[in-house]
């Protein structure tokens, strides 16, 4: 397994692996759709871009609204072969059997690698000390098309906590609204440390992370913890729940198989480089970890079996049926 301990032992081989990949393969062009420019997805994308450039792969990293947009983008945009999504988003999409497009997306979306746990950040006014306190409050739940939006709606539905108002705005807007008192709390699903909070939240803002310990929620989502001192004014660890970030591709057969396989080979052989030079969350990545309900893209598994080991956002085209289907199911 490509655990961190094994990966560190291979650190001295990094230059050799990169050189070999560069010499053996022609230059490749790939696109990766991520998330907010201040979120962990985007930082991971930039780390991957820097790594694979050394192997002759030109990786364009696109910001986006998040997981729901990303699933459809990988299916629909020719220059976007990969995306990062939350595990619960695709799990939810697979439940939709009435739409033929969604059925095809669910069937053909494949895992390149599992990445890391994404903690649910619930940031609010200091007087809000528990998830259940969101009842009768104004809560920002993320922009439609984001994984935060889906997870927030699922958590509220499962817990039967009913806010006074839910506000569909992106995380930058939500934080500004929270500071201005226009909302009382905001959701943000991302692996800590989140750049938006480390750069834009001060102790003087009077905000705090709200624990998520509701039993109805923890029956469905795995426990997680945001360590003490991760953010300003956070003296104690905060219990929460998490989802898994997953690097995905779409099984188009023959179109991008070789390029995605080369990309995966480069990443698998150079995890120590990412741990040393990338976002802190790379330290928790296990590229070989099993992930229930996900099948690894055979273009990746076959390639690894043989070897053993910021531009502007792409323009969306029209309506995203994934968003509409999710809203329809959650509103029932």
What residue spans do the PLM features occupy?
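Bilobed "Venus flytrap"/periplasmic-binding protein-like clamshell domains
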Residues: 27-53, 118-180
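Bacterial N-terminal signal peptides
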Residues: 7-18
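Extracytoplasmic small-molecule ligand-binding "clamshell" domains
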Residues: 28, 32-33, 39-76, 80-85, ...
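Pocket-lining segment of extracytoplasmic ligand-binding domains
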Residues: 87, 97-98, 161-256
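Pocket-flanking alpha-helical
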Residues: 49, 62-103, 174-177, 193-201
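An extracytoplasmic/periplasmic, membrane-proximal ligand-sensing/linker region
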Residues: 173-176, 180, 190-203, 209, ...
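A structural signal for short loop-to-beta-strand junctions that line the ligand-binding cleft
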Residues: 101-115, 231-238
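Ligand-binding clefts/hinges and TM-proximal coupling segments of bilobed small-molecule sensing domains
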Residues: 144-154, 221-292
């Amino acid at each position: 397994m490509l655990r961190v301990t094994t990966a560190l032992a291979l650190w001295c081989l990094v230059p050799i692996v990169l050189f070999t990949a560069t010499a053996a393969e022609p230059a490749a062009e790939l696109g990766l759709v991520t998330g907010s420019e201040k979120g962990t997805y985007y930082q991971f994308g930039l780390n991957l871009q820097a790594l694979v450039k050394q192997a002759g792969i030109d990786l364009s990293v696109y910001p986006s609204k998040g997981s729901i947009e990303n699933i459809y983008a990988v299916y629909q945009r020719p220059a976007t072969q990969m995306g990062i999504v939350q595990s619960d988003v695709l799990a939810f999409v697979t439940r939709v059997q009435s739409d033929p497009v969604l059925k095809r997306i669910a069937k053909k979306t494949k895992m390149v690698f599992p990445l890391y746990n994404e903690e649910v950040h619930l940031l609010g006014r200091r007087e809000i000390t528990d998830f259940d306190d969101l009842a009768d409050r104004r809560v920002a739940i993320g922009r439609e098309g984001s994984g935060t939006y889906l997870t927030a709606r699922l958590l509220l539905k499962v817990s039967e906590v009913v806010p006074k108002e839910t506000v569909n705005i992106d995380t930058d807007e939500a934080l500004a609204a929270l500071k201005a008192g226009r909302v009382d709390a905001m959701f943000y699903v991302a692996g800590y440390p989140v750049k938006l909070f480390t750069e834009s939240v001060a102790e003087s803002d009077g905000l705090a992370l709200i624990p998520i310990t509701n039993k109805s929620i923890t029956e469905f989502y795995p426990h997680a913890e945001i360590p003490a001192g991760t953010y300003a004014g956070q003296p104690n660890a905060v219990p929460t729940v998490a989802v898994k970030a997953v690097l995905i591709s779409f099984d188009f057969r023959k179109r991008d198989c070789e390029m995605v396989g080369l990309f995966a080979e480069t990443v698998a052989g150079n995890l120590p480089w990412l741990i040393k030079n990338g976002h802190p969350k790379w330290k928790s990545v296990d590229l070989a970890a099993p992930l229930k309900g996900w099948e690894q893209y055979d273009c990746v598994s076959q390639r690894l079996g043989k070897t053993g080991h910021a531009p502007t956002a792409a323009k969306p085209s029209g309506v995203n049926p994934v968003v509409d289907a999710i809203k329809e199911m959650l509103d029932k």
